[in-house]
Amino acid sequence: MAFASDESASPWSSTRLAALNAQFEPHGPKAILNWATHTFGDDLAQGTGFGPSGIVIMHMLADLRPGTTVFYLDTDLLFPETYELCDDLDERLDVDVTRVHGGLSLDEQAEQEGEELWNRNPNRCCFLRKVKPLRNFLDDRRAWITGVRRDQSERRADTDILSWEGQYGVFKINPLANWTQKEVWKYLFEHDLPYNPKHDQGYPSLGCVPCTEPVDQADGYSREGRWSDRDKTECGLHTSPEDEDGAHAAES
């Protein structure tokens, strides 16, 4: 399927974005990614935490445009299994896996902010170790691919396939927005792709070790177990500055 491709205006009008979203909705993620790679070329990058959705997209990108940049935000607090999976996927798939780090060590953060900031002010911790590094990395990009899906949480239920992210100055592409968790796992198994073994140990979603716990029984959302003792569901990467109790106001 060939979609309209005109990259002269940035950001594009809301009317144009709505029209493209309407075009994308009935088509599969590979068609959307094909449009994205042809439209944005080297100015495109996928961000992933190596969850099932991200791995599906990595596999598709390796086929559509080998060498595409796939980056992950290394907070220094990821599970050992996540780092191992990263290395495995880097060897298996023809994409350019890139580590993004904010440059602030955990010791330096403790000196500046106090010990275990993630327990006292998780929004501030997420800003320093995730949001700020992401902003810096995307500064010279035009488009960012994510694995966000509508069925992951109530907050994500209205996710568009294509949107303009003003806080980062890029177009955000969610090719799996209308896929279900079942479809994602079906794709993984059909293509014999690896996944994080922690998913078999009661972890629906994996982030940083201190802020992620297993759950006894999931309620259908794949982001359960994140900040389970708090009224917090997002790290701030996919929310506006006004969301999450002013998560991004934590930068001040």
Swiss-Prot record:
Source superkingdom: Bacteria
Protein name: Adenosine 5'-phosphosulfate reductase
Cofactor: [4Fe-4S] cluster
Cofactor binding description: Binds 1 [4Fe-4S] cluster per subunit.
Reaction(s) catalysed (UniProt annotation): [thioredoxin]-disulfide + sulfite + AMP + 2 H(+) = adenosine 5'-phosphosulfate + [thioredoxin]-dithiol
GO cellular component: cytoplasm
GO MF term set: 4 iron, 4 sulfur cluster binding; adenylyl-sulfate reductase (thioredoxin) activity; metal ion binding; phosphoadenylyl-sulfate reductase (thioredoxin) activity
GO BP terms in the entry: hydrogen sulfide biosynthetic process; sulfate assimilation, phosphoadenylyl sulfate reduction by phosphoadenylyl-sulfate reductase (thioredoxin)
Gene, per the UniProt record: cysH
Enzyme class: oxidoreductase
